[in-house]
Amino acid sequence: MNISGNDNKRIEYTVRVLLCIAVVLVGRLFFLQIIDKSDLQAKNLSQVQVDRKLQSPRGTIYDRNGRPLAMSVVTKSLYADPKMIKQSPSEVAELIAPYVTMSKADIVKSLQEDTAFVWIDRMMEPEKSKAVAQLIEDKNVEGLNFVEESKRYYPNGNLAAQVLGFVGTDDKGLDGLEMVLDDELKGGIQKELVATDRKGNAIFGSVLSKYLPDKGKSVTLTIDASIQFIAERALDKAMEDTGAKHASVIVMDPKTGEILAMANRPTYDPNHYSQGSEEDFKNIAVTNLYEPGSTFKPIIASAALASGKWKLDQVYNDKGSFAANGHVMQNWNGEGYGPVRLIDILKFSINTGMAEIGTTTGADILSKYVRNYGFGSKTGIELPGEGDGILYNPDDMSKLDVATMSIGQGIAVTPLQMVRAFGAIANGGSMMKPHIVKSYSNIKGEVTSTTDPEVVGQPIPEETAKTIADILEKEVSEGGGTKAMVEGYHFGGKTGTAQKLDTKNGGYLAGRYIASFIGFGPVEDPKFVVLVAIDDSKKGSIYGSQIAAPVFKNIVSQLVRYYQMSPSVKDGATVAAVPAAKLPAVKSNGDGSVVLPDFRGYTFGEVRDWLHTAGLYFKPDGTGKAISQEQLPGTVVSPGTPIVVQFSH
């Protein structure tokens, strides 16, 4: 076949065009793959990368027996990339609003932002995050996704709420120990730079940078969750019986200063702290200033005895009134008691007798002893908001001021200061520093530091302390504190009823009182000091002897069983500890869970029958009578939970 010159020219032209196109394509491909690759990657990632800062878990707070009081759990948080949302913001808001805390209007506003990352809801409840995840899948919603975050969880609800405090969304402690120990408990920050696909899901292997530090240290408290539960349950009953505005209880070991329980009412659940009020958050056992009233009389009496200004057998002829600086002080019943000694003055809380003792001792000596007891200064406990208290300047005190202070008026103290002072009386005059942190542990669970018991003073000699303790035992067994008496045990204590201070206008609030009782025991070998304060009772009596002393009895009658103390009888012999007639009836909560009682002292059959009735699995260890249990009294357990109880003959 012959090819003409024109045909050759056309073929040559076509080849040249194809070669040019090939060169252009190869050149462009080379530019894209080699020269412009890094620039394109940067542009692409700048559109879809997400810079996330996630908090690693806080350390756990345990009670003295290793029971968790505050812990961190993994939850899911919902975020959005508004640039990837295909549906209208209002449509997306309509879908997810029922399951998130953000309102529809705020969701719409967030989804209209010119950004690649906005939070929609942090630390969601599991059922709600599952519901949203299902909606995302069913409705093919793009641009919504979850990230795991650590959330603070309080497994016992409101137990020790004011002591523990709470943590904000950004893992910052906002109250209580969570705030004070924030640096110790807080973990580090996890930072991730993540590339995502068009649906907002992280692309596998696209984490550009990641730093995952260790979680925070753990803290063990001196608090005993079982004793805390006993105290709070007693307070709940007291609030119901009295209709009081506030109430508080402190339980302390006088030999170590360890706080075993600290409870307040009203209260709140730190899992839902946003539902609480400022009143609910107050740890009034530490922060509240009040006039101690008659509970202060043993402090004055001990100062008079220790200084030698008053003798134990010294007689005062009480005529029912005491005059000072033109004012007349009377007894609570307006009557005189005739010839009385110190034991009678304290036992029957005789105001006139205390005024005589105080003024005989003098302002300087009394003030010195009162300050040696720690009044007027903080205890230094590891809790926020502690008050100093208010005392007279001895140089400015009149005879009336001395008489007034001698009956616990004209000064202001905190409940914790009173517990510290009575701890000294119970502990042979040796005063311990109250503390609530027992130890710190690292992430491996190794104890790194402990809080050792610390003697902070000896305000009175041991002999004086024993004398006052014996007198206070008579106050409970024979005097005004008989409603605090627990049959078979020797407890010492003092009742108090004081008018409330008017902090705005000065003076006192008419008809408003703080009723209190503070005691310790057993007197022979004190294991605990217990203070009960009831603020502004609205129902029934206003007197500490009538409404605070029974709360003390309620608490210590359970404590002697918890400590397995054998009662003492008057002839000095002892009898074996026995439980109540029968275990409390099983009471199920709405979800079928039950609160475990204290099984100690009950027979194998009694414990078995109770657990079977409660729908729980009985795992006995031994036979005879119960001596201990793995799950502590007060633990809330679900149906079918194995309950381990140890028995012995």
Where are these regions (language model features)?
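Conserved "repeat-terminator" motif of extracellular CCP/Sushi domains
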Residues: 585, 637-649
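Beta-lactam-recognizing serine transpeptidase/beta-lactamase-like catalytic domain environment
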Residues: 2, 70, 197-208, 249, ...
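Soluble non-cytosolic domains of exported or imported proteins
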Residues: 56, 86-90, 122-126, 171-175, ...
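Generic structural detector for well-ordered beta-strands
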Residues: 220-222, 317, 459, 595, ...
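BRCT (BRCA1 C-terminal) domain core and associated BRCT-interaction motifs
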Residues: 618-638
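Periplasmic/cell-envelope proteins involved in peptidoglycan metabolism and beta-lactam response
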Residues: 1-273, 364-376, 484-487, 504-506, ...
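Short, solvent-exposed beta-strand edge segments and adjacent coil->beta transition regions
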Residues: 75-77, 115-119, 214-218, 285-287, ...
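Conserved SxxK-family serine transpeptidase/carboxypeptidase catalytic domain
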Residues: 17, 121-127, 131-133, 147-162, ...
